[in-house]
Amino acid sequence: MGRRILGQRRGRGTSTFRAPSHRYKADLSHRNVEESDLVTGEVVDIEHDPARSAPLADVQFDDGDRRLVLAPEGVTVGDEIQIGVSAEIAPGNTMPLAEIPEGVPVCNVERQPGDGGKFARASGVSATLLTHDRNAAVVQLPSGEMRRLSPECRATIGVVAGGGRTEKPFVKAGNKHHKMKSRGGKWPRVRGVAMNAVDHPFGGGGRQHPGKPKSVSRDTPPGRKVGDIASKRTGRGGKGGQE
């Protein structure tokens, strides 16, 4: 009798597979919609959050509110942060898309007005405000996709700090382990054909091969549901003279 495969263990939701969200420092969203046209604050610290790759700025606002916000490139301790309709066009300031000139890089862009920010939040990325229409602002996301958003959606001026992160190698397996552990990822990932027969349907044998068809039905039981699940087609497709 075989053991539970990795997918079945993950489905139980034990601490091995859950992200340690109790260590995360902030939910990271814009302030509530400002009642006045401008609120200012001072950056008192730059912090690291295990939940994300980008650094966070600890901002003390004049109205007594203190919160962590996404830190764009160029923002340092002691800088002034402005939030509101009449904020200046400077890195770190937050305002509606209607008040931002075309061609300015922005980050932490809202999808719907007041949702706190959904787009361009990873380290080193930014979106670009392309143009203003009558009832929409056209924004190019880091993926290249064009989105028509409400002019009332807010965004932060600048590029998210921490760029070049993906260019630096992990060097040691321990570094990769700690990175994956902080997000709840299971690592390393072992191939099924490299396992023993008791651990995976594709395991065992004198050589590494599945030993059975890889295509399985959508209704396959969990312990056998591995490989190409409900695949429409398999193989290399264009071989055999097909157009």
UniProtKB/Swiss-Prot annotation:
This is Large ribosomal subunit protein uL2. GO terms for molecular function: rRNA binding; structural constituent of ribosome. The keyword Ribonucleoprotein applies. The gene is rpl2. Part of the 50S ribosomal subunit. Forms a bridge to the 30S subunit in the 70S ribosome. Belongs to the universal ribosomal protein uL2 family. It comes from the Archaea. Residues 221-231 have a biased composition (Basic and acidic residues). One of its GO terms (biological process) is cytoplasmic translation. InterPro entries: NA-bd_OB-fold (IPR012340), Rib_uL2_dom2 (IPR014722), Ribosomal_uL2 (IPR002171), Ribosomal_uL2_arc_euk (IPR023672), Ribosomal_uL2_C (IPR022669), Ribosomal_uL2_CS (IPR022671), Ribosomal_uL2_dom3 (IPR014726), Ribosomal_uL2_RNA-bd_dom (IPR022666). The keyword rRNA-binding applies. Residues 198-243 are annotated as: Disordered. GO terms for cellular component: cytosolic large ribosomal subunit.
